[in-house]
């Protein structure tokens, strides 16, 4: 049978319980303070990095622009490739080089260049390909569209639904287009997502230009961006 506790023993046990609870509180406070400091340092690091390299660079590289922001921001007019094509766009397209393509050009091709913004599963992306021929070759636009749809598959598109039609912008430039939907695997969500695309092919003696626009399904801002880019297109004559 347990002996009854004395008042001194009870006081000691009570004091021990109080001490344990106080230690637990201090531990929680230290953890919270540590987490707060870590979060502050992370935010501070991002801000300093963004200030150093530019907020546009950080947003572009890590967060991306919404199509509404792209549509409403100040646009840039640039010249790309050969034969040169001039377009206005919300962001400058960056040249990409595929050594395999460059080292295996068809006999009649003088040069080809590729420029891009974004990736296939981004809210909005563009690929522009320019090709210069050694002679006054004018490509078959229907065959070019078929090749471009195969190129879309290389980008990662699956279940491609295709519609075709004519293209003409406000400046009178005309060509062929293919448009529709596809699915692509999104590494962020680890799921297939449904996208829309517009492909345009323009041709002139000695050269051709091909556009790929890819965007989230039913994104009205993306459609307005595409229309605005299309209407800005100007072509330079192919160099002889």
Residue ranges with predicted function:
Residues 123-124, 173-175, 203-210:
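Coil-to-beta-strand transition motifs
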Residues 90, 142-149, 198-199, 223-230:
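Extracytoplasmic/secreted envelope proteins and their assembly/folding machinery
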Residues 137-141, 189-192, 222:
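Solvent-exposed, non-transmembrane alpha-helical starts
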Residues 4-116, 120, 161, 167, ...:
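N-terminal targeting sequences that direct proteins away from the cytosol to non-cytosolic compartments
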Residues 112-146:
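A short acidic-to-branched-hydrophobic micro-motif
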Residues 100-112, 146-200:
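Signature of long, low-cysteine stretches enriched in small and polar/charged residues
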Residues 132-135, 182-186, 205, 217:
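Beta-strand elements of well-folded, non-transmembrane domains
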